[in-house]
């Protein structure tokens, strides 16, 4: 393999200059104004089309070959003429001999007619059709000229195409019809034109969606009304089971929703995943739509769905909808059923978990204020927040009595509570946990030294010393242990942990702490906290009572080591 070292400096300069020239040339050739042409005559034809010079084009008609040459996109001069605004230019190009009106471009498979429609050149469309262009030939996406005309919202082009035999029910690759497109665009005139010419209101695309569902999804009231009056099925469901009303709930258009309900739409019709219209409205944050659907949705339907709209509102981060649902008596602790829970790798069950995993402080606060429990999921909400570095959410969860000493043993079954694993690099988070009663003593329980008291529940579990011996964590052991020592009295360091710590820069400080008696102030705080118990320490009513003066409370609660609160106060 050649390397740059094999070339002289002069050769390298020549090579670089040539590369730059090639790059510039490629960029030039790819630009719309400089598409490759075979002959000078073709270049003149293309320039005349771009500049609208009809007289030059007439002169070039004798060079018929110039009109048959394609550029680098596979475009003939006819394709360019069809998509430019001067009708006389197109008419002049059409006078050239041996031109097929159905020639396709190399990219996109566009015909002159589809290009004219996309460019919204109604006179060009009419001229091409009058010259014999087929209204049925599609581009490479199987999109017909009629479908494209509806998409750009041109009633004139749509009418012209229909008058020249365009088939209203022609489908694209996804079996999407002009009726679907009209429902999406929301053009009443076009829809009425299609209906008068054979448009079917219950035609389904490849996903089972009808024009009515499309209109409802995009909140087009008048289109929805027309389709219903023409016999569209109000409770039609797509292949995924989503109903027309569910689509309307996603748009949030209350007029559409009410219209569907007045015409017999069932608010308790579930999708394949079990979702109802109320779930969609809650997730999307459509407050007024949700307000309409709450009294119409049965508790039985929600139970069968296996998921509460509270889950949906929390997942979507919709605080107003969340408050509305809770105010109407929806259970804040409703657990998703197993079927829905299995759709998530973490097997989540509670609405609180959605809020916490999304890092949504406001929704978390609302749910906790309404009495949300913190221990309803296989993986604790607190562990999720700690792992994500969400300090404010961790504080909220701890204030709501989340268990700081919980365990999650699926990944690693440790002697010490799991939360510490997720914040070894984050002193702020570590101290947030330690200040709120994390059992630091469990980090110094192991079986390595014979002189150490045997502990039954250590057997078969991973002690802290072994966990920190992992090569990816060893460099964190010094700082972690130094922090932990602020929350214990005298502890024994096992030989395994000692060997790890001796290689860390924090070892001299750790050694001094271990070999010196702890201060009376430090020991008093530990004893007071032990006597109070974690339950009382976590109770705001007790800790905010007159029994504890502010200074004493701050001392007991390790306020001088609460790095998060200190940083927050500095910002404020």
List PLM regions with ranges:
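Ankyrin repeat start-site detector
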Residues: 40, 72-73, 107-108, 140-141, ...
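Cullin-RING E3 adaptor/co-adaptor recruitment helices
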Residues: 2-25, 36-37, 411-413, 422-431, ...
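Ankyrin-repeat start motif
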Residues: 43, 76, 111, 144, ...
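Ankyrin-repeat C-terminal turn/loop position
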Residues: 65, 98-99, 133, 166, ...
């Amino acid at each position: 393999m050649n390397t740059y070292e094999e070339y002289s400096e002069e050769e390298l300069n020549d090579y670089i200059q040539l590369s730059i020239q090639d790059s510039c040339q490629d960029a030039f050739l790819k630009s719309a104004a400089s598409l490759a042409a075979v002959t000078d005559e073709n270049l003149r034809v293309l320039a005349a089309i771009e500049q609208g010079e009809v007289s030059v084009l007439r002169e070039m008609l004798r060079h018929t070959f110039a009109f048959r040459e394609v550029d680098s996109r596979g475009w003939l001069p006819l394709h360019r003429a069809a998509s430019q605004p001067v009708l006389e230019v197109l008419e002049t190009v059409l006078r050239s001999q041996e031109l097929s009106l159905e020639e396709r471009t190399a990219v996109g498979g566009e015909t002159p007619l589809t290009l004219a429609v996309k460019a919204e050149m109604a006179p060009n469309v009419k001229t091409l059709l009058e010259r014999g262009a087929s209204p049925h030939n599609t581009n490479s996406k199987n999109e017909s000229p009629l479908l494209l005309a509806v998409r750009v919202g041109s009633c004139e082009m749509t009418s012209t195409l229909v008058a020249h035999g365009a088939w209203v029910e022609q489908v694209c690759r996804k079996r999407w019809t002009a009726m679907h497109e009209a429902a999406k665009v929301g053009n009443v005139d076009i829809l009425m034109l299609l209906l008068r010419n054979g448009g079917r209101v219950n035609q389904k695309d490849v996903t089972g969606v009808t024009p009515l569902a499309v209109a409802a999804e995009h909140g087009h009231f008048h289109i929805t009304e027309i389709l219903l009056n023409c016999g569209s099925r109000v409770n039609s469901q797509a292949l995924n089971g989503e109903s027309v009303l569910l689509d309307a709930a996603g748009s949030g258009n209350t007029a559409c929703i009410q219209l569907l309900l007045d015409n017999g739409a069932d608010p308790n019709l579930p999708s394949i995943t079990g979702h109802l219209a109320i779930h969609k409205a809650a997730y999307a944050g459509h407050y007024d739509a949700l307000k309409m659907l709450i009294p119409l949705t049965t508790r039985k339907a929600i139970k069968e769905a296996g998921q509460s709209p509270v889950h949906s509102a929390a997942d979507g981060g919709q605080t107003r909808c969340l408050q509305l649902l809770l105010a109407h008596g929806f259970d804040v602790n409703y657990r998703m059923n197993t079927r829905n829970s299995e759709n998530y790798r973490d097997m989540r069950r509670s609405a609180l978990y959605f809020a916490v995993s999304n890092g949504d402080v406001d929704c978390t606060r609302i749910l906790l204020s309404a009495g949300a429990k913190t221990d309803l999921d296989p993986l604790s909400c607190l562990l999720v927040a700690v792992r994500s570095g969400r300090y404010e959410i961790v504080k909220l969860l701890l204030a709501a009595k989340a268990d700081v000493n919980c365990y999650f043993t699926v990944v690693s079954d440790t002697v010490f509570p799991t939360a510490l694993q997720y914040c070894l690099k984050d002193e702020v988070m570590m101290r947030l946990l330690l200040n709120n009663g994390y059992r630091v003593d469990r980090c110094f329980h192991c079986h390595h030294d014979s002189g150490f008291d045997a502990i039954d529940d250590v057997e078969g579990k991973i002690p802290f010393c072994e966990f920190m011996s992992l090569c990816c964590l060893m460099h964190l052991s010094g700082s972690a242990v130094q922090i932990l020592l602020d929350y214990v009295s005298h502890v024994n360091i096992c030989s395994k942990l000692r060997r790890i710590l001796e290689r860390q820069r924090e070892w001299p400080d750790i050694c001094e702490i271990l070999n010196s008696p702890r201060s009376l102030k430090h020991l008093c705080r530990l004893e007071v906290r032990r006597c109070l118990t974690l339950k009382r320490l976590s109770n705001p009513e007790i800790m905010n009572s007159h029994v504890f003066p502010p200074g004493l409370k701050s001392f007991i609660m390790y306020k001088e080591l609460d790095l998060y609160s200190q940083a927050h106060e500095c910002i404020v």
